[in-house]
From Swiss-Prot:
Listed InterPro entries: YaaA (IPR005583)
Pfam family, one: H2O2_YaaD
GO biological process: response to hydroperoxide
Similarity section: Belongs to the UPF0246 family.
One GO cellular component term noted in the UniProt record for this chain: cytosol
PANTHER family assigned: PEROXIDE STRESS RESISTANCE PROTEIN YAAA (PTHR30283:SF4), PEROXIDE STRESS RESPONSE PROTEIN YAAA (PTHR30283)
Signal sequence residues: none
Protein name: UPF0246 protein NMB0895
Length: 259
């Protein structure tokens, strides 16, 4: 069983990683192709392309200029400790022990606009390139065309090597669109997290993102390899709702008063 997650825009570059183990991204040669093009963009072009402030555009122009291989622990950081958004706050990998972190390495993959598909302990350098960015490149008009079936093929290889036939999709639609589900050789399960508000259950983005990270943490802490065991997920008041679920979409609900 493998999980896929989206990356995060916010990055934690300052704090040292709690573990020394690391791996290298499998698709770094592809990343280098993209970065060569990104380096050609002036800050104003980055601001327009990514719809960000001049300050953020300048920061990322500097990141692009400084991006260089080979990646080492001195100039890069493991992805699971670099990403710093809602999902990763829910996962809180910094407080997992080494056995649990190795579980993440063996069961979790992170989608990325620049790096394609990452293992949690893959070293990365800071960047900003969301998968949905309309970044015209050598292979097409956007990143979905750039990556084509590369991410899907690597996922299939990863699943096959592990003898796994289940992929748990905890990524956003923007990122999971980079996976060709028609060519994916795995059973696909998509957990959906709903919170009660004014008597009705709905997906609330912040809570849903955090819950995705919580589920991965739950799996790591319990060393889950059987997807059915995920139905026992109960962190922060969530509970599996069988009546609202089907074979491929598993719904977890949380009552308003529990938060």
């Amino acid at each position: 069983m493998f999980f896929v997650l989206s990356p995060a825009k916010n990055l934690n570059e300052k704090d040292p990683a709690p573990v020394s183990e690391f791996t290298q991204p499998d698709l770094l040669a592809e990343s280098d192709i993209l970065m060569q093009q990104l380096r050609e963009l002036a800050p104003q072009q980055i601001a327009e392309l990514m719809h960000v402030s001049d300050k953020i555009a300048l920061l990322n122009a500097q990141r692009n200029a400084e991006w260089n291989t080979p990646f080492t622990p001195e100039n890069a950081k493991q992805a699971v400790f670099m990403f710093n958004g809602d999902v990763y706050e829910g996962m809180d990998a910094n407080t997992l022990d080494i056995g649990q972190i190795r579980y993440l390495q063996n069961h979790v993959r992170l989608l990325s606009g620049l790096y394609g598909l990452l293992r949690p302990l893959d070293l990365i350098q800071p960047y900003r390139l969301e998968m949905g960015t309309a970044f015209a490149n050598l292979r097409g008009k956007n990143l979905y065309e750039f990556w084509g079936d590369i991410i899907t093929n690597l996922l299939n290889d990863t699943l096959a090597q592990a003898g796994s036939n289940t992929l748990v999709n905890l990524a956003s639609q923007e990122y999971f669109k980079s996976v060709n589900t028609k060519k994916l050789r795995a059973r696909l399960i998509t957990p959906i997290f709903k919170d009660e508000k004014n008597g009705k259950y709905k997906i609330i983005s912040f809570y849903a993102k955090r819950a995705r990270g919580l589920m991965v943490r739950y799996a790591a802490e319990h060393h889950i390899t059987d997807p059915e065991m995920l139905k026992n997920f109960n962190y922060e008041g969530y509970a599996f709702n069988d009546a609202a679920s089907n074979e491929s979409e598993w719904v977890f609900m949380r009552s308003e008063q529990i938060k």
